[in-house]
Structures are given as C-alpha cells and as structure tokens.
Amino acid sequence: MAIKSDRWIRRMAQEHDMINPFYEKQMRQGVISYGLSSYGYDLRVADEFKIFTNVNNAIVDPKHFDEKSFVTITSDVCIVPPNSFALARSVEYFKIPRDVLTICVGKSTYARCGIIVNVTPFEPEWEGYVTLEISNTTPLPAKIYANEGLCQILFFQSDEVCEISYKDKKGKYQSQKGIVLPKL
C-alpha cells in the first residue's frame, strides 16, 4: 500500500470525480490553506455546524444520541465552546475508489491553537460529504472559518482490490449529504 501523489490525486479527481469541487493547487493567500498538496488534499469545512451543548442531557450515549444535544447554525464562522466540540461537513463530495483507503490528519494551523479534527478513514467505495468532528481542547472559545481548510486527506492505494467494500456492505454513512449524527 503506497501513499498517492498530487499527480494521481489530480487525475482521479478530474477523470473519476473523486473530489468535487476540486482545487488543483493549494489556495493559501489570506486563508487557512486548502486544495491539492504534494501527497494529499486539504478539504474545506462548509458553513453548516452543529455545536454541542449539554443543556438538555447529562450524559452522551452513542447508542441513544439525542439531536437536541446540538445547536445548528449556518455561518461564515463557528465558535466552539471551551472544552467542547462541534460537527460540520466538508464542502467537497468524495467518491473513493475500491482499492483506496484514506486517512485524515489535522492542519497544523488549527492544531497549534488547540483545535483537533477527527475523521474516520474513508473506506473503499465510500462516497459522500465528510462529517467532521472539531474538538476545542482549550479553556477559551475557538473560531473555525467556513470555506477554508480544516484537515488533510491522505490517499493510500492497495496492491489488490478488497473483497468487500463499504458500498458492498451497505455502510450506514454511505452517500451522506449533510452532517450525520451517530447511527447504530
């Protein structure tokens, strides 16, 4: 399994619609960078956010998650409360090939401010907008900028095609369109 270069990512985006919309160079001027990089793609966060609040619940239960645990906003910025988190989605829609797995890593600009991004791998043949988990590890409110870079996706291509893909097993987050809460 090898990490894929900018040439491969560009070709797959242009010929197979793997990333849409796709920026074939890194946009950096006056923004938190996004677009194609040497060995990855920096995705952007959309202007839709769900900010966690504990007003309605005393416990977080992934098997019985209450949508009322979030305040939904649409804005150019999201203020994540101290020691809390928000959910968001990517601007880009991804279609992952059957022989590819992705890993997401946070951007250093946010990490140096105590903001951590968590995204599980995009499995072979998964497609959709990415639901992003943004944690504020600081004791102060943290600002997230919509339509700017949030994290980097690294693409790994296997030397053989998987037996069962995410699409084959009818994964519960397949073709997600917006911010999707936990499902069982």
Curated annotation (Swiss-Prot):
Entry-linked InterPro entries: dCTP_deaminase, dUTPase-like_sf, dUTPase_trimeric
Query: For binding dCTP, which residues are annotated in this chain's numbering?
Result: K107, S108, T109, Y110, A111, R112, T131, L132, E133, Q152, Y166, Q176
Q: Which pathway is recorded for this entry?
A: Pyrimidine metabolism; dUMP biosynthesis; dUMP from dCTP (dUTP route): step 1/2
Pfam families, sorted:
DCD
Active site: residue positions:
E133
Q: Which GO terms describe its molecular function?
A: dCTP deaminase activity; nucleotide binding
Question: GO BP, one example?
Answer: dUTP biosynthetic process
Protein EC: 3.5.4.13
Can the keyword Ligase be found in this entry's annotation?
no
Catalysed reaction(s)? dCTP + H2O + H(+) = dUTP + NH4(+)
Q: Which UniProt keywords apply?
A: Hydrolase, Nucleotide metabolism, Nucleotide-binding
Role: Catalyzes the deamination of dCTP to dUTP.
Fetch the PANTHER family from UniProt: DCTP DEAMINASE
NCBIfam families for this protein:
dCTP_deam
The entry's family comment says: Belongs to the dCTP deaminase family.
Q: Describe its partners and assembly state.
A: Homotrimer.
Q: What is this protein called?
A: dCTP deaminase
Per the UniProt record, the source organism is Koribacter versatilis (strain Ellin345)
